[in-house]
């Protein structure tokens, strides 16, 4: 099991409940695949450095988790097919 960190930005058109529902969805992907979520830091709505997909702000979330090496690929796939995700990044923690 390795430690990972992911940051993702969600569309600002979501309301607060939609934002939290998406975060719970990604947490459940990790937990259903046998991983554990160590920390979730909701940064809230922030301005982007530049426009992405014609939006200039988004909901930022930082999530730390522990999982096997296949889970980040599955989480990346889920991020890509979720329309509300503007940007995401998954890195391995040393």
Swiss-Prot record:
GO terms for cellular component: cytoplasm; ribonucleoprotein complex; ribosome. InterPro entries: Ribosomal_bS6, Ribosomal_bS6_sf, Ribosomal_S6_plastid/chlpt, Transl_elong_EF1B/ribsomal_bS6. Keywords: Ribonucleoprotein, Ribosomal protein, RNA-binding, rRNA-binding. Transmembrane segments: none annotated. Pfam families: Ribosomal_S6. GO terms for molecular function: small ribosomal subunit rRNA binding; structural constituent of ribosome. One of its GO terms (biological process) is translation. HAMAP family: Ribosomal_bS6. Belongs to the bacterial ribosomal protein bS6 family. Binds together with bS18 to 16S ribosomal RNA. PANTHER family: MITOCHONDRIAL 28S RIBOSOMAL PROTEIN S6, SMALL RIBOSOMAL SUBUNIT PROTEIN BS6M. This is Small ribosomal subunit protein bS6.
């Amino acid at each position: 099991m390795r430690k990972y960190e992911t940051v993702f930005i969600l569309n600002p058109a979501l309301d607060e409940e939609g934002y939290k529902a998406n975060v719970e969805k990604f947490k459940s992907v990790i937990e259903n695949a046998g991983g554990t979520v160590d920390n979730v830091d909701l940064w809230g709505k922030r301005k982007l450095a530049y426009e992405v997909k014609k939006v200039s702000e988004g909901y930022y979330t930082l999530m730390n988790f522990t999982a096997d090496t296949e889970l980040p690929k599955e989480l990346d796939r889920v991020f890509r097919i979720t329309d509300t995700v503007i940007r995401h990044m998954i890195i391995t923690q040393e």
